[in-house]
Amino acid sequence: GLPCGIAGVRHSVPAARYLQLVERIQDYITAGDCYQVNLTFALDFDFYGDPLALYRRLRERQQVSYGAFIALDDGHILSFSPELFVQRRGTTLVAKPMKGTMHRGGTPAADDALRDKLAQDEKNRAEHVMIVDLLRNDLGRLARIGGVQVDRLFEIEDYATLFQMTSTIRGEIDESVTLDRVVEALFPCGSVTGAPKLRAMEIIAETESRPRGLYCGAMGTLDPNGDFCFNVPIRTLVLDGAGRGSLGIGSAIVHDSRAVDEYAECNLKSSFLTGLDPGFCLIETMRCDAVGFLNLELHLARLTASASYFGFSCDCDAIRTGLDQLRGSPAGSTPWKARVLLSKDGEWTLERVALGKGSAGLPLMLAPRRTDSGNILLRHKTTARRLYDDEFARALTAGYCDALFGNERGEVTEASRGNVFVKLDGVWYTPPVSCGLLPGVMRSLVLRDPRYSARERTIRMEDLPRAQGMLLTNSVRGVLDVRLGAASRSCAVAMQQ
């Protein structure tokens, strides 16, 4: 399927600010205001691809009992919550608070050791008991006298990236207890507030920089007979309709919490999302001749920027050394191109490819399929370029040098193998990146070259028939004079009419 994932992850609270907030909360704890506060922040990000496909990929990584995919008019909710807030079956209420986290090991033996470590850890058990007691008291407001019991205390559940400590609390209620009474007594879940609940919520309102929204609320199902089941929407993505999303994460702060450890725990909890392999590699292709690699630092700068955006590890010094070795000595006089492939885990490969004869003098073909200007992948050089490869092959078969694309608004974007410049009314123009295209290295050089005095401007397909010239640019071939093929020119004229 088509790639789907996230990029451009941004913390709503910087690490330094988070450490300050932990200190403030611990001052409240020392003063006796509370004994536990759940401190949270958000990861904001861009997403690409189909939300349902993203849900399926993440569900493979986060096998949970209380997940949900909800399509809304203005976005989607992708919940991968492992935590039960409250469930009703007849006259029985069940809550299953989750508090206590440990990372997974690399081997079964390491997993066993870490699982046991979490189960016996005094700090995690103390935090957990605080919330179990809080939930027992909340359920006690609804249950019959003596009707609350803890069935399973300090259970450890296994997930793909971590272990979690849970307990199961059961309360027997009268048949007359209604949903609104349950919500009034239990909401919000104590595991995401702290204890005592009301004072913890006041401190949260003072310290957290923005409302939590759905995160830490409740979502679930209602049955006609009055039964229901609600999760706590932790590990839950909220996606809008414009390619942006957020994920709330947090941890419990107590008097002996170490702020750096709590911040690391938050990052561990979000790793099911941030560690998702995007299903593609980053690419850089550059020309090499007797002098060396052309515009090497510009290529490595673009690779570094894309790696940062998509969360790839990238060691440019190692890649630079590898390129020097690939080039060898002496360099030789026949130009060739080097191709760099970088995967998310930082692994990279280099390939030396001979330059073909090219297709100078052949015209451009208008690609029949449009691109989406909002597709963030178009702004980065990746292996997720099936549409471009298909249209390039179609163009070559039909006797053209390349395929020229337009977006959903009828704006010219780029060719499958380079950027395009169009001369209109005596001035060279190239489409802005916002139209949905790669900011090519050669494109940036031409924009800075006084010989062209080129500018960025939206170019519509119907502008092409009156073009006084066209250039195709890429860092391997340089700047090529091209023209629109007769059939494609006729199509552009038809658009104009």
Task: Tell where the protein language model's regions lie, with residue ranges.
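Extended alpha-helical targeting/anchoring segments
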Residues: 1-282, 407
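Helix-start/capping segments and mature chain N-termini
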Residues: 128, 165, 232, 249, ...
